[in-house]
Amino acid sequence: MNKHVMLCVGSATQDVFLGGKVFTPECEGEVCYEHLKLGDKLTVDELTYATGGNAMNAAVTFARQDLETHFIGLLGEDPAAQAVLAELDKESVHTDGVVSSAKYTTSYSVILLAPSGERTILNYHGEPLSSQPDLVDEANIKGD
């Protein structure tokens, strides 16, 4: 019987969630806005670090289903990359297809959480995989 091997190619992100009463949207009809005064220093009530990104989330999901899973993506050599790699390792996702370089910066998101559960995401997209097209080719993908 052939064992399925999952290959997840794409983004991995470190997320930081900031929540609290300071994020209270003002609504104009059905559209709500968060108004943050420039120059203010705001205190948040909640701080949570996590990891995500489409390919990383898929890889973790498959690994939790006891499928052999490999992640291919570009990461920097920064604290966000360390968090991503630690989480993938904890979840038993193979990272032999990861390319890490000081010339890249790992994707990073700051998620502002309103008490209602609504969120606003500030996202820095790291190096696009399209900048390394040779990273994913048939020679790098092993299978039956």
Model-derived features with residue positions:
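Glycine-rich phosphate/adenosyl-contacting loop at the front of the ribokinase-like
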Residues: 1-70
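Short hydrophobic segments within beta-strands
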Residues: 9-12, 72-74, 113, 122
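Short secondary-structure boundary/capping elements
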Residues: 47-57, 80, 102-103, 128-133
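Short, electropositive alpha-helical surface patch
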Residues: 73, 77, 81-89
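A glycine-rich helix N-cap at a beta->alpha junction
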Residues: 87-104
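Conserved phosphate-binding/catalytic loop of the ribokinase/pfkB sugar-kinase fold
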Residues: 96-101, 111-144
